[in-house]
């Protein structure tokens, strides 16, 4: 029994030490730009493991040198309550939960009506804020477990405590994936439009923002009807997006 308690204590201590390490890294980001993220390193290893060339395009640019159109487009598309929440948008999570439950119920009904007919899996929505996405990409693995989601919540709150909204958005826009080996706003602007992130037009910014949930897929499908339609929607919402 003592051995079991000792083992549990060691695991708890290791978990606490890891979280403290993450928090210290976040605090340092108030003045230091992260050289890479956990997600980026994972992508690099995947490319190397496939014996292909390492594709990595990224160039850090200060917040002031990123088009206001892109900032507004990303907020409008990914997290319209960004400036007001404290890292986690509970209302968005509740809405996502309801949509997912409704979609799963519809799938269950379809399977009951035609059990031998294949049914397309529902699209799962997460309701993650920009801060949560940054916490996940910066520091966490890609696994989908309740423990990792809990870590994401804790780290999102830490990001909001130690960093300003402007700094969070700056780090996010400089590190988010925008295609195969394309990371950050500057690399994306040059890859897709042959211009600096500072000079993106509203339509270009909206299109880049719409790509974010599935950048590799949309990179291969530039003529996607969904991409075009969603771009028009985000263009209409950009004027109401509040910047930090």
Predicted regions and their residues:
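Juxtamembrane regions of bacterial inner-membrane/periplasmic proteins
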Residues: 1-244
């Amino acid at each position: 029994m003592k051995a079991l308690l000792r083992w549990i204590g060691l695991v708890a201590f290791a978990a606490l030490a890891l979280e403290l390490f993450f928090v210290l890294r976040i605090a340092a980001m108030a003045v230091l730009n992260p050289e890479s993220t956990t997600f980026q390193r994972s992508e690099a290893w995947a490319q190397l493991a496939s014996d292909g060339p390492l594709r990595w395009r990224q160039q850090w640019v200060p917040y002031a040198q990123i088009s206001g159109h892109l900032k507004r487009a990303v907020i409008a598309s990914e997290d319209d309550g960004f400036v007001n929440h404290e890292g986690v948008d509970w209302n968005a999570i509740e809405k996502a939960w309801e949509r997912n439950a409704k979609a799963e119920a519809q799938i269950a009904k379809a399977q009951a009506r035609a059990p031998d007919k294949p049914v397309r899996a529902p699209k799962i929505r997460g309701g993650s804020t920009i801060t949560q996405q940054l916490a996940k990409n910066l520091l966490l693995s890609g696994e989908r477990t309740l423990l990792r989601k809990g870590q994401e919540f804790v780290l999102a709150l830490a990001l909001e405590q130690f960093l300003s909204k402007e700094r969070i958005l700056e780090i996010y826009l400089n590190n988010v994936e925008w295609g195969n080996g394309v990371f950050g706003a500057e690399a994306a602007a040059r890859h897709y439009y042959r211009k600096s992130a500072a000079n993106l037009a509203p339509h270009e910014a909206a299109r880049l923002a719409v790509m974010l949930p599935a950048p590799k897929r949309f990179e291969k499908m530039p003529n996607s009807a969904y991409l075009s339609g969603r771009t028009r929607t985000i263009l209409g919402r950009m004027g109401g997006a509040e910047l930090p």
